Regions:
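Glycine/serine-rich phosphate-binding loop and adjoining beta1-alpha1 elements at the start
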Residues: 1-115
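Glycine-rich phosphate/diphosphate-binding loop of Rossmann-like nucleotide-binding domains
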Residues: 78-191
Length: 192
């Protein structure tokens, strides 16, 4: 693995680090379409997957399956439209399906429909953000977001579309208008 804080590097440096790491994995046989296929996770995105793909293609130009050496890449690198939000959509669709089965809802000691629930999301990265957006944009109420640097809470609900705009400009969810900051975000998981 590679353990770095991507916030401490500029884009050019991150690209060099990522490609060098990828080349070493490729040379050692740990990364290929048939062996191990990286996907975006914490601290990585479509951008890094594109860099890894570029590194793979430069070392294995004759591999006709080179595009399959990573998943989660951008459409212009051979990725699939909708991939970015797919996991978050899956969370939303799973919740919808769960609430269609009243017997299962009752067994879980929950009442009402999905839109009757007050929901707290853990994480505001790709999965958390897109889960929250699908839930909110379909009538659900998100009352809290727990993130690594703290959380936010509003018992009446948070406008996820406005929060996303805020997060993209501030690089944090903290101090979002009309919410309370929660220092220890894990405490949020017990709020109602």
């Amino acid at each position: 693995g590679l353990l770095i804080d991507p916030l401490k590097y500029d884009e050019e440096s991150l690209e060099k680090i990522t490609k060098k790491f990828a080349r070493e994995l490729i040379r050692r046989g740990f990364l290929s379409p048939a062996r191990d296929v990286p996907a975006p996770d914490v601290g990585t995105s479509q951008r890094e997957m594109g860099w890894i793909l570029d590194a793979y293609k430069s070392l294995r130009p004759d591999d006709i399956n080179h595009v399959a050496c990573v998943t989660g890449k951008s459409v212009d690198h051979g990725g699939i439209k909708g991939r970015l939000e797919a996991t978050g959509r899956g969370v939303f669709e799973s919740l919808k399906e769960f609430f269609r089965h009243s017997d299962e809802v009752k067994k879980a000691n929950i009442s009402g429909s999905l839109n009757d629930q007050k929901i707290i999301i853990q994480g505001f990265g790709n999965v958390g953000l897109n889960s929250a957006k699908f839930i909110f944009n379909n009538g659900g109420t998100i009352i809290g977001i727990a993130e690594k640097d703290g959380g936010i809470f509003n018992k009446n609900g948070i406008d996820i579309n406005e929060l996303e705009k805020y997060w993209l400009t501030k690089n944090t969810i903290l101090d979002f208008p009309n919410t309370d900051n929660i220092v220890n975000s894990s405490d949020l998981l017990f709020y109602q």
